Amino acid sequence: FLAEENIIPDSYKETNQRYMDAYLNGTLQMEDWGKFSLVFYDGKTAEDIKETMERFFKEVFEPMINIFALKKIHHHYENNDYLLLATATNEIIAKFAAARLGFDDYVATKIVKKDQTIYTNQIEFPPAFKEGKLTMVRQWIEDQKWVGKESFFYSDSVNDLPLLDYVSHPIAT
């Protein structure tokens, strides 16, 4: 999307595909991925990127939403379940995605900020990836006093095995 909008060079597509292949294979190095994938945000505020993010979600994200996923989300919503999005994706995209899908909260890879408002191309550790995602979800559970409650987690990634092993109802899609 960013390359098509001439926001980043076309050459990023090939590099992005290599990172996606590494993610799918379980070999992604998140620090390197962060430096690459966050280049668009570097030096910008949330207000600076708002319009681009809204277009991305309307033109790219929403058409990609799987009807199976929407049905599952709706099922949990109808059961008055609390919906927490846990994703390795950066916090900016996760915030938009959680809002668009009707989630109550989200856990995502955090971006280092300058002066608390200006994004960089660096991620905070731990990222919400592999064991780091489990660590962040456990922290969220503790902070929200959610301990001992039934939990479901849906994933299509080998990178989520730690969290799938942790929840009461793991669902590999």
Q: Which residues does each PLM region occupy?
A:
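A metal-dependent, Asp-based hydrolase signature
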Residues: 3-75
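C-terminal cap/substrate-recognition subdomain and adjoining C-terminal extension
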Residues: 51-54, 58-173
